[in-house]
């Protein structure tokens, strides 16, 4: 849509790439993750994901204060539904897409998403899954954590796509259908 907000996403991507190059390439001595460590990793991941997820709002100028952008991002990732924005439709389209996408990611849990795309082996992924998924579901769905995450997200993709199709048949344009599907799936 030829918006300047794309620059904010490129800046955040560059920041994250630099952080990865400095810290992410060092492998720990032990790859074993225990239950307590799983809870710490989940907590830190939520904090960091939210902290960096707020940056596009601030860098683009859509939300001028970082604390407000952080609130908006945490609200999305936790699917709280609260907002500090008086006029959501006034956001640039790229930022509006990001805001809705945070709700979609939050719908299944950030950590389940991260587990699906990372290379954790199943033995080390299960403590993270137990820390992220409420109730006994983590142990009962499938013993392989990565497989479970892929299965859940497969169903989530299908539900999201179905909602987009129904909204398109209802007369909504593709962009708005995606935003509504991300925010309600």
Task: Put a short name on every predicted segment.
Residues 1-185:
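Membrane-proximal intracellular helices of multi-pass ion channels
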